[in-house]
Amino acid sequence: MRLPLLLSAGVLLVVSLPCPPCRALLSRGPIPGARQAAQHPQPLDFFQLPPQPQQPQQPQARPVLYRMGEEYFLRLGNLNKSPAAPLLPASSPVAGGSGSRLSPDEAAANFFRALLQQLPLPRRQLDSPAGPAERGEENALGSRQETPERERRSEEPPISLDLTFHLLREVLEMARAEQLAQQAHSNRKLMEIIGK
């Protein structure tokens, strides 16, 4: 009884000890005109974007928790929300609104829309063996042909999640039937062995 109590007290003491600040979480460099910033760098605020310098050199990446929050809301299907948004919006049932959850199709459409926004578009088809000189001619001629095809693709509805789950159910039923057939076969063999 004493050993678990001592171990848990020791773990709590170790957890509550102050640790040196992590260098990865500290600001990238000293603030111009401040000498104390170089000695005691300030930790980054994860939910706020870093301040933009006077002369933008490169687009800076957003803080880690902000990006993780975006991924969380993306998985929920709410692209319009951000981690900095209030936790209980007016449309949520907990807040008293009459909001409803997105359907699986809408959530999937949101996910794929955000995914396509992040992916770079390919410049040519992978199966075309065109060289650099031929690519310019193909782009000039192929742009007219690709436009109706792109419009046609955009008009087609996305694959329904109902279809996906229907196919999954069918595969599971087939696996279950095969498992029952194997079980019946092994039971027959067992009965033949015992019956002899």
UniProtKB/Swiss-Prot annotation:
SMART domains: CRF. It is found in: Secreted. Residues 1-24 form the signal peptide. Residues 146-156 have a biased composition (Basic and acidic residues). Residues 25-153 form a propeptide. GO terms for molecular function: corticotropin-releasing hormone activity. The keyword Ribosomal protein does not apply. One of its GO terms (biological process) is positive regulation of cortisol secretion. GO terms for cellular component: extracellular space. This is Corticoliberin. The gene is CRH. Pfam families: CRF (PF00473). Keywords: Amidation, Cleavage on pair of basic residues, Hormone, Secreted, Signal. Produced by the hypothalamus. Interacts (via C-terminus) with CRFR1 (via N-terminal extracellular domain). The modification Isoleucine amide is found at residue 194. Residues 122-158 are annotated as: Disordered. It comes from Canis lupus familiaris (Dog). Hormone regulating the release of corticotropin from pituitary gland. Induces NLRP6 in intestinal epithelial cells, hence may influence gut microbiota profile. Belongs to the sauvagine/corticotropin-releasing factor/urotensin I family.
